[in-house]
């Protein structure tokens, strides 16, 4: 049985429909989706704008990547400016370390240092410092006593307990040899008041740890001034006297020998030295 074809049921395709089908793959059915898309003869405005944007983005990306290449980096003006700035900073730092300060700056610094030294070594500052120190030392010495013939095994705590009835004690000092560290056998006791010194002197010739101790008020030692007759003057005078004594005896020997030669006999007097 042959199929029955009727133009009324299936009219022939028109030219407009053919153009639409050829440009739109969806209108061709599902079989047309698997085939490669045919380019339209009439380009659309939207597709052209999209392709232009993609082209611009590709150009920008390729330009940025080209800037990162070493050859293009060396040719870049921004890179050259930054490199020159870094080189200039390094050069300035090296020259600042190697080159000395200008003479005016050095002269100003030396003048300031000299002014500070003059101020520190000025008589007013030195006198004020030494006067304050000497006054404090003199005041402490007036409140202290010297304790001699102290037993070597005695401690500062034992001395403090022994002299505590005399008054409040600020400090007990037992002098020791700086080389061996052994005590020298005497000590200094500093009291809080002058009255305690008088009471402590009353313990003179008393017995401490089986030994008779000597208690005296402490002397005040001034720098450069000796409180005894011993000193450089005595040594100088002694040397001078020895020199005079030796010169007199030398002259006496010369005279004795001269007379013996002149008279041809023994001298009238003899010096054994």
Curated annotation (Swiss-Prot):
Domain RRM: 143-220
Top-level taxon of origin: Eukaryota
Pfam families referenced in this protein's UniProt entry, alphabetically: RRM_1 (PF00076)
Predominant localisation class: cytoplasm
Record-linked Gene3D superfamilies: 3.30.70.330
The protein's role, per its UniProt record: Binds the poly(A) tail of mRNA.
Protein name per its UniProtKB record: Embryonic polyadenylate-binding protein 2
UniProt lineage: Eukaryota, Metazoa, Chordata, Craniata, Vertebrata
Gene: Pabpn1l
């Amino acid at each position: 049985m042959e199929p029955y074809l009727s133009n009324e049921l299936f009219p022939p395709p028109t030219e407009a429909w053919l153009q639409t089908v050829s440009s739109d793959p969806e209108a061709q059915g599902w079989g047309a989706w698997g085939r490669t898309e045919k380019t339209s003869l009439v380009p659309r405005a939207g597709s052209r704008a999209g392709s232009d944007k993609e082209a611009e983005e590709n150009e920008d990306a390729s330009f940025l990547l080209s800037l990162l290449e070493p050859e293009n980096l060396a040719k870049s003006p921004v890179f050259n400016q930054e490199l020159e700035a870094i080189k200039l900073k390094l050069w300035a730092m090296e020259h600042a370390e190697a080159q000395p300060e200008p003479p005016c700056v050095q002269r100003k610094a030396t003048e300031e240092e000299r002014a500070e030294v003059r101020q520190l070594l000025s008589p007013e500052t030195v006198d004020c410092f030494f006067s304050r120190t000497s006054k404090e030392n003199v005041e402490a010495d007036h409140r202290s006593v010297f304790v001699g013939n102290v037993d070597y095994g005695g401690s500062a705590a034992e001395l403090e307990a022994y002299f505590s009835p005399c008054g409040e004690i600020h400090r007990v000092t037992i002098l020791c040899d700086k080389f061996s560290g052994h005590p020298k056998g005497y000590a200094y006791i500093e009291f809080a008041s002058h009255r305690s010194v008088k009471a402590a002197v009353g313990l003179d010739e008393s017995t401490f740890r089986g030994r008779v101790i000597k208690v005296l008020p402490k002397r005040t030692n001034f720098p450069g001034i000796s409180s005894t007759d011993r000193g450089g003057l005595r040594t100088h005078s002694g040397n001078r006297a020895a020199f005079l004594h030796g010169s007199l005896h030398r002259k006496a020997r010369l005279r004795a020998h001269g007379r013996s030669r002149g008279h041809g006999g023994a001298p009238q007097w003899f010096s054994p030295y």
